């Protein structure tokens, strides 16, 4: 079932209509990231029936040219944000012979079935969490619940306390939930690097007859 069907009812709800109007109004008055056409990139690039992994972020990067609708990802040519750099360090720990990419665009992950979902989908330039209370989490909670209900054998990578608050939305009997500290430099040393989440994800997928993710 496509997103258009799964989320049609949600997008008609008053809260979502008001949320979208508020974002549109903000675009008239300030710079909002990501660009309008990229807000739903995570959903555009990863159909529900293809989802193997969900990586939850918080809200988009708030610097120029960084956010393009995929959690943790930046377009090619943009400097690696620290959390993303630490994610690739963790991949290198899990797969020591890996040659890491020179860019931080995770579109190839999305195309393989990794839903790179921020819980808040827009932000004002230079003002982290500025749209956090606008209603986005009601929408993305629904996305998480729909993924849990409509799929089987998906790995949910929940890094940091914000992402881990979403555990009640996920059916742990038919999915794999992996938790670790956030890859931010503030917390990564507390257990992110030795969580081995990238290898564990692929081990789980293969155990359930699914193609592993090519992380690089």
Curated annotation (Swiss-Prot):
Protein origin, superkingdom: Bacteria
Annotated keywords: Cytoplasm, DNA damage, DNA repair, Hydrolase
Gene Ontology cellular-component annotations: cytoplasm
Key word Phosphoprotein present: no
Keyword Membrane in record: no
Entry-linked Pfam families: UDG (PF03167)
Catalytic activity field: Hydrolyzes single-stranded DNA or mismatched double-stranded DNA and polynucleotides, releasing free uracil
GO molecular function: uracil DNA N-glycosylase activity
Main location: cytoplasm
Full protein name: Uracil-DNA glycosylase
Enzyme category, top tier: hydrolase
Summary of the function given for this chain in its UniProt record: Excises uracil residues from the DNA which can arise as a result of misincorporation of dUMP residues by DNA polymerase or due to deamination of cytosine.
CDD domains for the chain: UDG-F1-like (cd10027)
The organism of origin for this protein: Idiomarina loihiensis (strain ATCC BAA-735 / DSM 15497 / L2-TR)
Compartments (UniProt record): Cytoplasm
Entry annotation: catalytic residues: 59 (proton acceptor)
Cited InterPro entries: UDG_fam1, Ura-DNA_Glyclase_AS, Uracil-DNA_glycosylase-like, Uracil-DNA_glycosylase-like_sf
Enzyme Commission code: 3.2.2.27
Gene3D superfamilies, per the entry: Uracil-DNA glycosylase-like domain
One Gene Ontology term from the biological process aspect of the record: base-excision repair, AP site formation via deaminated base removal
Protein family per UniProt: Belongs to the uracil-DNA glycosylase (UDG) superfamily. UNG family.
């Amino acid at each position: 079932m496509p997103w258009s069907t799964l989320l049609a009812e949600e997008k008609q709800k008053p809260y979502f209509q008001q949320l979208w109007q508020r974002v549109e109004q903000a675009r008239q008055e300030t710079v909002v990231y990501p660009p309008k056409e990229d807000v739903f990139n995570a959903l555009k690039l990863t159909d529900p029936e293809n989802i193997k992994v969900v990586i939850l972020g918080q809200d988009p990067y708030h610097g120029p040219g960084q956010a393009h609708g995929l959690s943790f990802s930046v377009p090619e040519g943009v400097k690696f944000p620290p959390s993303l750099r630490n994610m690739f360090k963790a991949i290198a720990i899990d797969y020591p012979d890996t040659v890491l990419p020179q860019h931080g665009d995770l579109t190839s992950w999305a195309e393989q079935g990794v839903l790179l979902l921020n819980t808040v989908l827009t932000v004002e330039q230079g003002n982290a969490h500025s749209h956090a209370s606008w209603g986005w989490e009601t929408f993305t909670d629904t996305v998480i619940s729909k993924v849990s209900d409509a799929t089987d054998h998906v790995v949910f990578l929940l890094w940091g306390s914000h992402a881990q608050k979403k555990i009640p939305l996920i059916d742990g009997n038919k999915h794999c939930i992996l938790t670790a500290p956030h890859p931010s430099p503030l917390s990564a040393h507390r257990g992110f690097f030795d969580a081995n989440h990238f290898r564990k994800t692929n081990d789980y997928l293969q155990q359930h007859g699914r193609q592993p993710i090519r992380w690089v």
